[in-house]
A protein has these predicted regions:
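Catalytic palm subdomain of template-directed nucleic-acid polymerases
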Residues: 177-193
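Reverse-transcriptase-like RNA-dependent polymerase core
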Residues: 55-58, 84-108, 121-130, 156-165, ...
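Single conserved hydrophobic/aromatic residue that forms the stacking wall/gate
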Residues: 227-236
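Non-catalytic, well-ordered alpha-helical scaffold segments
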Residues: 19, 23, 35-38, 42, ...
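Active-site-proximal segment of RNA-dependent polymerases
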Residues: 5, 123, 130-182
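Phosphate/adenylate-binding "loop-and-lid" substructures adjacent to NTP/NAD/dNTP-binding pockets
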Residues: 37-109
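Short, conserved non-catalytic motifs in the polymerase core
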Residues: 62-75, 94-121, 137-150, 172-173, ...
């Protein structure tokens, strides 16, 4: 049965397979072999184990019970194993995000876009192929939304810099107003080293709020797994 097929998949073997591919992506990126990087990314995003781990990720995280506009949840093993076969680039068309508003401490509300389970899994899949590049080329002193990094690491770096005998006298705090709301789609497509057609579809998928469909001509949805990669990286 489908449920038995799901239970029979060796997750450790899947993780080893993906980890080795990611290590090869890092090696190719460091050697400047961008064609090789692309082919390895393609291999990862089309692999059974990569697609399996993407389904595992979205069905075990905190949002596993939160559905998108289609109200579909992958709550059974049978649904999960069937989902693996749906994660294909050919013919893929993401659905609009379901927008909800989250109350903030200051009384205002923060919009959050909730993708469907399938779109979340596709994002998780492509993120596996993108993360090795982001971690290789990203700023070593960037800590926000980075793997294995936290605000404690940022604090430690500030302490290291500011405790020196010859230390900076000023600390500049800056904030880009409405950064994710207005970031250029053209810039993202030119600078994010991933499948451009898939990225374009995510950026242009729109969102549904109060039963009405809205287009997305600029900015990235707060809820899109790849937004943390939006810091400058080296394009192909």
């Amino acid at each position: 049965t489908d449920a038995e097929r799901w239970k029979s998949i060796d997750q450790r073997k899947a993780e080893d397979y993906v980890r080795k591919l990611q290590a090869r992506i890092v090696k190719a990126q460091r050697e400047g072999r961008h064609g090789k990087v692309k082919s390895l990314q393609w291999l990862l995003t089309h692999s059974f184990y990569g697609r399996y781990l993407a389904v595992v990720r979205v069905t075990t995280n905190k949002g596993k019970n939160t559905a998108g506009v289609d109200r579909v949840r992958w709550s059974t093993d049978a649904a999960k194993v069937k989902a693996i076969d749906t994660l294909k680039r050919r013919g893929y068309q993401p659905m609009p995000l379901r927008r909800v508003e989250i109350p903030k401490k200051n009384g205002k509300k923060r919009p959050l876009g909730i993708p469907t389970m399938k779109d979340r899994a596709m994002q998780a899949l492509y993120l596996m192929a993108l993360d090795p590049i982001a971690e290789t080329t990203g700023d070593q002193h960037s800590y926000g939304f980075r793997k294995y990094r936290s605000c404690q690491d940022a604090i430690a770096q500030c302490h290291n810099v500011l405790s020196r005998d010859v230390a900076p006298k000023w600390v500049l705090e800056g904030d880009i107003k409405g950064c994710f709301d207005h970031i250029s789609h053209k810039w993202l497509l030119n600078n994010i080293p991933m499948d451009k057609e898939v990225l374009r579809k995510w950026l242009k998928s729109g969102y549904v709020f109060n039963g009405e469909l809205f287009p997305t001509d600029e900015g990235t949805p707060q809820g899109l797994s790849l937004i943390h990669i939006s810091e400058p990286t080296r394009p192909y």
